[in-house]
Amino acid sequence: MIKITSKLYIHFLTIITAVICIFSHHAAVFAISYGVMLLHEAAHLAAATAIGLRIDRIAFYPYGVNLKLKNRFVHNLADEIILCLAGPLVNCAAALISLSLYNVYRTPYLQLFYVDNTALFIFNMLPVCPLDGGILTKRLLSYFFGGKKAALVMKIISALIAAAMVTLCVYMVYVTEFNFSVLLLT
């Protein structure tokens, strides 16, 4: 990890990815994709700050952006819901706004912004830890059924979703051309 400031870090592979994107004429795709991920994490940061949590660092990885908090423990369910939903809801709102704008200004950049926000919203709402949907689902299950039952249910849900993704990957390899990005998700 390369330390940019006391709270900002960039993985060296992220820089290599950016350089490859620039030289292969995909700089806009890289910028929009990382912009969408940064928007998501900025929403979590705003929510965390609003409920009294402090930031440790923001790190840019080749696969995304990560916000790490100093004091992750959230005392009540309402604050946990706010923290977990902030990022996905901002992505959902950005997707709806960009879709509306795309209906007027048909640019590939607006289309990509819409697709990236929609994909990040859907992916992050999957009930699998450490995704936002998984953290929220586990916290809700813990609230109603206790920690042990919640952990067991989350293991089952995670296994089912992983099996579904592997099945989808096998199906796509069998029926269509090989899609390495789907394989990476599994």
What function would you assign to each model-found segment?
Residues 1-186:
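Hydrophobic transmembrane alpha-helices and their immediate loop junctions
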